[in-house]
Amino acid sequence: MASQKKGNMSLLIILMAGLFLAILNQTLLNVAMPHLMTEFNVSATTIQWLTTGYMLVNGVLIPLSAFLIMRFGGRSLFLTAMLLFTAGTLICGISPNFSTMLTGRLIQAVGGGILQPLVMTTILFIFPPESRGKGMGIFGLAMMFAPAVGPTLSGWVIENYSWRIMFYGLVPVGVIVIILGFFLFKNMTEPKKIKLDTAGAILSVVGFAALLYGVSEAGSDGWDDPIVLSTVVIGVIGIAAFIIQQLKSKEPMLDFRVFKYDMFSLSSVINAIITVALYAGMFLIPIYLQNLVGFTALQSGLLMLPGALVMLVMSPISGILFDKVGPRPLAIVGLLITVVTTYEFTTLTINTPYMYIVLIYAIRAFGMSMLMMPIMTAGMNQLPQHLNSHGTAMSNTLRQISGSIGTSLITTIYTNRTTFHYASMADQTNTADPSFMSTLQSTIQSTAQSMHISLEQAQQYVVKYLTGQAQLNSNVMGINDAFMWAAGFCVIGLVLSLFLRDVRKDKLHRKNKAEELTLLPAPKEAKES
């Protein structure tokens, strides 16, 4: 038993290392985008395909992961995924042009898309329900810490070295994980010779790819853009057809019957809400720090580092607490903290102290470390073992979709409210108002005197300055409004978390009832006595 536990822990470390690399890789490029635009001489729209392409491949593969795990087994799939990811990373590092870089990213995405649900499914096999929180807490360490530390690491590399170092550094670690996995990874279940549901696969690929692409473009192009509308509609129709087809199938590729289990359904909804709130912070804070306040990428990343370290420490602890107290106490406390700290971000100004933001972000990370993995585990614990791979595929698919929709929604709110606030400020600068014009003329004259320039030059300077300040302040207010929406989503999650329960107690209750029934005398014996 001791040797088995030791072997499981060694396997868990290997799995986490592979998963950490894959998730870290998703956020490393964000800071490097301007450098890559210069390096490859491409536009911002073109370079964005490094992120969009990765997301689309991930989103298409995750729903197929349940079939892949059952068909090829965990060991072969893990080694293949890591091999593809490492090869793609090397191609990115040595790429002489954008086309090669994009090819490397797509190969990376194939490996990364397989790894997330595979690692989660393996953990569910390694840990029984009564100690599963510990395993999922360690899983959450990679899921939460990697994207949080990514901006800091990439910012440091970009400021001190070439962007290629970000990829070269991952290759040897990937090779080590492959070698260790080859010797230590054993299949939890034997592969089954099942056939690929071709119709389901086509509907899945078309539906999820179209929806994710449409939603990702909506943030920049708007929801009324013809391409956005058409791809979202195609995606929704494709996914609806996929669901109907899978429910009729005797051997579904992705079994939607997992939603018959109430705690799995509830935990999926809560996690989708939390994902929106998480992505809001990851998207809005860098915009505020870099675009508005003027911090460097490294300074922005360093601000998020304490929060990342909090998640590093708290994720395993939250898993242990889950095994002892269940999901509801953790979810309620975590969401209360998340609601309060997210609301605090609705009061940002240009002059908000740096350390105040560091503190609030770290406390917010503390709250979130109690949420995603414990709540996900609460739902997964209700599923029978044969549905584990389908449950993990479904959870990761919903996470991918909610993350994309959340980012797009937050972007739309931010841009729309920024436009609204700028228009409101423009209305207040009424040139027909004598008081306003008197103040403006006085400012122009004092500027001309202090800077020793003509009145015409001073007027141009003052107007330009006031316009810039209006744009700056309207952007900050737009960010505040977007955080208000994120806080509202968290409140909904908090209310829903009150209905969470520990399904392990359900199972224990049924077991005790069954034992009581076996101890009762037979009806005839009871009558005679």
Map each language-model feature to its residues.
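Transmembrane core module of solute transporters
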Residues: G7-M70, S99-L102, I107, G140-A142, ...
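Residue-level hotspots within transmembrane alpha-helices of multi-pass secondary transporters
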Residues: V31, P63-L64, L118, A148, ...
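Helix-loop-helix hairpins in multi-pass membrane proteins, especially solute transporters
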Residues: M55, I62-G200, P226
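Membrane-embedded alpha-helical segments of multi-pass transporters/permeases
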Residues: L90-I94, I178-F183, A240-I244, Y343-T346, ...
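Small-residue-rich alpha-helical segments with characteristic i,i+4
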Residues: M136-I138, M143-V149, G155, I357-Q441
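Symmetry-related core transmembrane helices of the 12-TM Major Facilitator Superfamily/SLC fold
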Residues: F167-F182, T231-G235, F483-L498
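Helix-loop junctions on the cytosolic side of multi-pass membrane transporters
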Residues: I179-T198, I244-M253, F420, F499-H509
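Hydrophobic transmembrane architecture of multi-pass small-molecule transporters
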Residues: I401-D502, K507-S529
